[in-house]
Structure formats: C-alpha cells, structure tokens
C-alpha cells in the first residue's frame, strides 16, 4: 500500500507535483493558504495563478524553455496540458488566458478522488511523512522562518515585478498595428510605434517618475529577466531599444518604415479584451503609470485593468540543501520544488515540481529516487540548482548552456 504524500502550496510547482503523484495512484493532501490568507501578489484563490506575465516564453525546440516544455509534455505535465488548452495568439511564444489556465488546473486537481484539498496555512515543516514544500517565493513568514532554520543558511532574495494590463477597447487602433516580429507565425502582437522625439520624451518622464516604496528594495537586487522598465531606462538612453522597445522586424504598415522604437502589447485573455504591455514590469506609483504609459502612441486614452507592481521573492541556497531529485540531503522524504529552489520562470517552476512529484511518488511506492539525466532540460536544471556554489547562486531560467554542459 503506497504511503500518502503531503504537498504544501498549489502554485505551478505544487500543482504539477500533485498531478504527478495522483496519476501514479498516490493519495495527496494538498495544502493552499489562499484565499484564507493572501500574498502581496496573488489576486485569487485559484491554483497555479500567474501573478506576472501570461507568457510561458518560446515554444521553439531550438530554445531551452521550448525544449523544457516538450520534455514536460512527454511526461504528461498538467501545467503544459493547461497551457496548450488555454493558449492565446503570441507568435512563436506560448501565452495563455491566465484565468482559464488557473481554472483548468484547479478544476482538474479538485476533481481527482485521491487528492484532498485543505485551504489552510501550514506554519511548520511536517516532522514525518513524505512531504513536498512548494510554497513559492511568497512563502508566509512563519513557514519561511522554519525553512531557513531547517536549511541552516540565510535565505536569498530578489525582486520581481508584473506589467500593466490595458482594456482592448481603449487602445487607438488607428495608431497601433498588428504584427509579429519578422512576420514569424500569425500576427499576434499590437505594436505602438514611436519616433525618436516620442521615445526621448517617454524615456525622460519614465526616469523622473515616482516609484512606490518597497521595503528593502535596491535597484541592483532585481532579476535581470524581469527588470522594472524604469530601472532599465535609467541604465542608458538607448537601453530599452535593445530590450522591450526593440523595433527590428516590426515595420509599420502605415509608413512602410521601421519605427525608432516599438512598444508591444500581447493578448492577455481568450476574448482579446485585455492586453498586457510586454516587458513593462514596473514599481511606479499607479498614478505615475497612468501618466507616463499614456504617453505611448495608441495608449493616450488607455484604461488600465491592472497596474504593474513589484514584490520580493525569497529562495533557498539549494546547493547546500538539496539533491538532484529535489530531496533534502539531511532528511529523506522531504522535497522542495518551485521558485523557492532557485529556478526562475513559470515553466521551470512547474518542471521542478514534476521532478519532485515523480520522486516523491517513487518514495511512497518504496522505490529509490532518481536524478534526471544532465543532458535533458529537466536534468540540467536540477543539476544547476544543486551543484552551483551556494555563495554565488542567482536564480536561473532554463538555459542551453546548462543543457550542453551535461552532454
């Protein structure tokens, strides 16, 4: 008779781990503190809520995260099932209707006979039994303190941010145009063209804009892949032109020319009634977001459905704590998964949950845990978070560099 497994946290990693356990016949007690206790970033009590972008990045197999997605599809990933079923147009990327995505994951797990959902906060690490802790970078203070004591190391952190979302019917379609970069795939993005003067005025006001106060925030304490747009602008007058405002491959059909800069909008829901401003993660005050982002051509009268915001993400010094199966070195049967382990990104978090779920299931069935091969996307990611120097351990997206190191 297989043992029961406790999963703490129903984010991307915890949801994926629960699915991998349940499909192997294991009974799971799944604990999620939302909606009874909220976090600074979540807005619902749904499982696998996407708190930042609605994009899961590239779908191309030549890209590390595209390869990771495909491995997960072959391993019957719930998160990939949900993403594929709820995707919205995004060119060569995989973007989803965030509400439909979370609902699919929630309904699937709540519908399983061998999953019992508990809407309550866990404040201590269970002393016995097989457990997966996947409470994410916004782990409650009480449990975060217990995890820090268990790991015996100081927790690490970085700051993450979300981009604003605007209502589609408030976008000036006489100015913006629909196109994907280099015309790859379908025309999936709305593009707001800027001339040099507009770009320079926008940059100047963006740098001057007032930011919200966030305890402990430092400009050098952000994840490079999710940098606030105002921090990027302050790095140099043309920095944004090589980032989210890059105009190459986005010729304006109205003029036949490539604009000086382009702000892209990506569909955020299946009804195409909302669009997020791509790459515009921010911690400007809400009034300043309205003032400055309304300078973008086509968004002069934009109605903001959600303003951007920033939050602190905490993670462990995993190389000192975990094995490549995401199991604690000093306590067999205790696993960790998700961004709290040092992986960064939606797909990476879910991937770590998949590996932890598979190994917790093996433990419950009396089998030995396994380390995925280092020359796979899943295995190379686990190898990174468990063998890198703990003193120099930044959070990391899937990377072909780590994949190739395993070959």
From Swiss-Prot:
GO terms for molecular function: flavin adenine dinucleotide binding; tRNA (uracil(54)-C5)-methyltransferase activity, 5,10-methylenetetrahydrofolate-dependent. Pfam families: GIDA (PF01134). One of its GO terms (cellular component) is cytosol. It catalyses: uridine(54) in tRNA + (6R)-5,10-methylene-5,6,7,8-tetrahydrofolate + NADH + H(+) = 5-methyluridine(54) in tRNA + (6S)-5,6,7,8-tetrahydrofolate + NAD(+); uridine(54) in tRNA + (6R)-5,10-methylene-5,6,7,8-tetrahydrofolate + NADPH + H(+) = 5-methyluridine(54) in tRNA + (6S)-5,6,7,8-tetrahydrofolate + NADP(+). GO terms for biological process: tRNA methylation; tRNA wobble uridine modification. Its main location: cytoplasm. Keywords: Cytoplasm, FAD, Flavoprotein, Methyltransferase, NAD, NADP, Transferase, tRNA processing. FAD binds at residues 9-14. Its cofactor is FAD. The keyword tRNA-binding does not apply. Its EC number is 2.1.1.74. InterPro entries: FAD/NAD-bd_sf (IPR036188), MnmG-rel (IPR002218), MnmG-rel_CS (IPR020595), MnmG_N (IPR040131), TrmFO (IPR004417). It is found in: Cytoplasm. It comes from the Bacteria. Belongs to the MnmG family. TrmFO subfamily. Catalyzes the folate-dependent formation of 5-methyl-uridine at position 54 (M-5-U54) in all tRNAs. PANTHER family: GLUCOSE INHIBITED DIVISION PROTEIN A (PTHR11806), METHYLENETETRAHYDROFOLATE--TRNA-(URACIL-5-)-METHYLTRANSFERASE TRMFO (PTHR11806:SF2). This is Methylenetetrahydrofolate--tRNA-(uracil-5-)-methyltransferase TrmFO. It comes from Lactobacillus helveticus (strain DPC 4571). The lineage of its organism: Bacteria, Bacillati, Bacillota, Bacilli, Lactobacillales. The gene is trmFO.
């Amino acid at each position: 008779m297989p043992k029961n497994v406790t999963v703490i946290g129903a984010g991307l990693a915890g949801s994926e781990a629960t699915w991998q356990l349940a499909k192997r016949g294991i009974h799971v007690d799944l604990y999620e503190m939302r909606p009874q206790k909220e976090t600074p970033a979540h807005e619902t009590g749904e499982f696998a809520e996407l708190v930042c972008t609605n994009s899961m990045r590239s779908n191309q197999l030549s890209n590390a995260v595209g390869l990771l997605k495909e491995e997960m599809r072959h391993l019957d990933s719930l998160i990939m099932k949900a993403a594929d079923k709820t995707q919205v147009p995004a060119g060569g990327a995989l973007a989803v209707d965030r509400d439909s995505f979370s609902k699919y994951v929630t309904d699937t797990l709540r519908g399983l006979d061998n999953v019992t959902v508990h809407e309550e906060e866990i404040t201590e690490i269970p002393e016995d039994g097989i457990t997966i802790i996947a409470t994410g970078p916004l782990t409650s203070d009480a449990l975060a303190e217990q995890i820090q004591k268990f790991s015996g190391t100081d927790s690490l952190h970085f700051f993450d941010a979300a981009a604003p979302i605007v209502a589609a019917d408030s976008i000036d379609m006489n100015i913006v145009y629909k196109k994907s970069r280099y015309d790859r795939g379908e025309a999936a993005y709305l593009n707001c063209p800027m001339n040099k003067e507009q770009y320079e005025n926008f940059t100047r006001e963006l740098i001057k804009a007032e930011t919200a106060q966030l305890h402990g925030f430092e400009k050098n304490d952000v994840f490079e892949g999710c940098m606030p747009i105002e921090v990027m602008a302050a790095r140099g007058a043309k920095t944004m032109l090589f980032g989210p405002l890059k105009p190459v491959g986005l010729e304006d059909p109205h003029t036949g020319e490539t604009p000086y800069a382009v702000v892209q909008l990506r569909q955020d829901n299946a009804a195409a009634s909302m669009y997020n401003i791509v790459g515009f993660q921010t911690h400007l005050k809400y009034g300043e977001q309205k003032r400055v982002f309304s300078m973008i051509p086509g968004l002069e009268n934009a109605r903001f459905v959600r303003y951007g915001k920033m939050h602190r993400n905490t993670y462990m010094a995993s190389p000192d704590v975990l094995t490549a199966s995401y199991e604690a070195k000093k306590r067999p049967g205790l696993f960790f998964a998700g961004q709290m382990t040092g992986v960064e990104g939606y797909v990476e978090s879910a991937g770590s949950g998949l590996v932890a779920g598979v190994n917790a299931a093996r433990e419950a069935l009396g089998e030995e845990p396994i380390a995925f091969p280092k020359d796979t996307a899943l295995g190379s990611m686990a190898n990174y978070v468990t063998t890198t120097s703990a003193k120099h351990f930044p959070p990391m997206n899937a990377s072909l560099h780590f994949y190739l190191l395993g070959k």
